[in-house]
Amino acid sequence: MEEKMKHFVGPDVSMKETAVCVVDDSGQRIWEGSVPSSADRIAATIREKAPELLRVGMETGPQAVWLWHALRKQGIAVDCLHARRAAAALKLQANKTDRNDAFGLARLVHSGWYEPVAIKSLDRYRMRAVLTARERIVRMCTTMINQLRGLAKTFGLMLSAGKGQVFETSVRRVLPDDTVLRDLFESLLSVLSGLKDQRRAFDRQLARFAREDEACRIVSSAPGIGSLTAIAFVTAVDDPARF
């Protein structure tokens, strides 16, 4: 019985459309086209055009995480290729187009000359997203405090040293009679208060993550390791078996 030809697929993903190329065992192009950048449409195209699929290879990028998980969920064997390393192979194409990039990715995954990039679980990405959002909020609070201090100096308002509520009380104590400046300081203090409320909400959410996640509980059991450090470590490592 004649062995069926294996297929390899390279999708070049963009926001609206994804260029897809299918190559056979010999690396020859047997189908190419474009489909909407929907996991269902991409998966359906792969199943139709590459019935003897061995592997799909796509570059890392902004949409790689959700698409990798979505395709895997539909039973499609897909690897993520480091964008910088894939770029070296794609430079060999005569003309850089989405169509040619898809062909280059299909040829690359056919060759096997690549190391797949580890994609973390969606739970880890969710936890990391909240942690990153909290970090941004903290930076925004610092920026707002510095702006308030700078404005106070500009208009000769003397603020006492202190952080948190002490700082806000200090600002309110020296609010000028000038209605424009008073309204400005009140507005900035209101923004700062809102940022702090959101930071506290993130703190509660992250504390819940740390309590409910087994790996976080293990890491945070070490002396001096709090929930934020535990989450940062666990979400960076994800699967210890890959090290």
Predicted regions mapped to residue ranges:
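A detector of single, family-specific signature residues
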Residues: 1-243
